[in-house]
Amino acid sequence: MQKSCNEKEGKPKGSEAKREDEQPCGALEGQRLEGNFRQRLLQSLEEFKEDIDYRHFKGEEMTGEEEEMERCLEEIRSLRKKFRALHSNRTHSRDHPF
C-alpha cells in the first residue's frame, strides 16, 4: 500500500493542514512527463516538416537520385557475387587440400 507524502517524510497524516497551493506527490512527475511528451511531439513535428519538404523534389532531381541508387545497388550485387565466389573457392580448397 502506498503512503501519502506526509507519511513518507515521517510526519503523521493529519498534523498539517493542506494548503490549496500545495501539489500532490505525483503532480511534479506528471508535469515532467508532460514536458517530455511536448518536447518529443515538437521534435517529431519538425522531422515531419523536413520529410514533407523532401517530397517536393523536381522530377530531374529524383531521376538523378534514382540512377545513383540503382548504381549503388548494382555495385552491392556484384560485390555479393564476388564474396560468394571467394567463399565457395575457400570451402572447396578445404575439402581437397592436395
Swiss-Prot record:
Residues 1-22 have a biased composition (Basic and acidic residues). The keyword Transcription regulation applies. InterPro entries: TF_A-like/BEX (IPR021156). Residues 59-89 form a coiled coil. It comes from the Eukaryota. It is found in: Nucleus. One of its GO terms (cellular component) is nucleoplasm. Residues 1-33 are annotated as: Disordered. The keyword Oxidoreductase does not apply. One of its GO terms (biological process) is negative regulation of DNA-templated transcription. Keywords: Coiled coil, Nucleus, Repressor, Transcription, Transcription regulation. Plays a role in the negative regulation of NF-kappa-B signaling at the basal level by modulating transcriptional activity of NF-kappa-B on its target gene promoters. Associates with cyclin D1 promoter containing Myc E-box sequence and transcriptionally represses cyclin D1 expression. Regulates telomerase reverse transcriptase expression and telomerase activity in both ALT (alternative lengthening of telomeres)and telomerase-positive cell lines. Belongs to the TFS-II family. TFA subfamily. This is Transcription elongation factor A protein-like 7. It comes from Mus musculus. The lineage of its organism: Eukaryota, Metazoa, Chordata, Craniata, Vertebrata.
